[in-house]
């Protein structure tokens, strides 16, 4: 008997809707990353993208504990001398709240082509409206 390995053509991928309102940022990101990896499925295979599609709404209403709103910083470098841009988590949540959750989940996924394919299945939106009603996502309570 041989060990089962999933094939990319035969993997069943479902669509799930997650409401981020009142959820802790890190705990939500961890569960989203596990679902994108496919670790919640019995057919999980490390070298095959077995994860589901995730639609996250109300990203601006995510919660953080402690003083992270003022003490946690995101840095990005423009490539020019002296242009290291920094902004706190509070500022980032005001400017682009969906990106905060995307960065948290992306850091938990593999670095490489497979990780990028998994990351593309994450759809994050501010507010409760999303353009994926045609896929009929199932509500997922995390």
UniProtKB/Swiss-Prot annotation:
A GO cellular component annotation in the UniProt record: cytosolic large ribosomal subunit
A single GO BP? negative regulation of translation
Q: One Pfam family for this entry, by name?
A: Ribosomal_L13
Instruction: Identify the domain of life.
Output: Bacteria
Q: How does it assemble?
A: Part of the 50S ribosomal subunit.
Give the protein's function.
This protein is one of the early assembly proteins of the 50S ribosomal subunit, although it is not seen to bind rRNA by itself. It is important during the early stages of 50S assembly.
Q: Which family does it belong to?
A: Belongs to the universal ribosomal protein uL13 family.
This protein is called Large ribosomal subunit protein uL13
Q: Which organism is it from?
A: Xylella fastidiosa (strain 9a5c)
């Amino acid at each position: 008997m041989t060990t089962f390995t999933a094939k990319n053509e035969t993997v069943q991928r479902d669509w799930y809707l997650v409401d981020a309102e009142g959820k802790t940022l890190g705990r939500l990101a961890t569960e989203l990353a596990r679902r994108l990896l496919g670790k919640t499925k019995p057919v999980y295979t490390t070298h095959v993208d077995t994860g589901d599609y995730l639609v996250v709404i109300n990203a601006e209403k995510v919660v953080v504990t402690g003083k992270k709103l003022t003490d946690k910083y995101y840095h990005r470098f423009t490539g020019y001398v002296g242009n290291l841009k920094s902004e706190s988590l509070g500022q980032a949540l005001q400017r682009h709240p969906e990106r905060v959750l995307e960065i948290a989940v992306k850091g938990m996924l593999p670095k490489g082509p497979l990780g990028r394919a998994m990351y593309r299945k994450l759809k994050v939106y501010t507010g409760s409206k999303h353009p994926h009603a045609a896929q009929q996502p199932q509500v997922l309570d995390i």
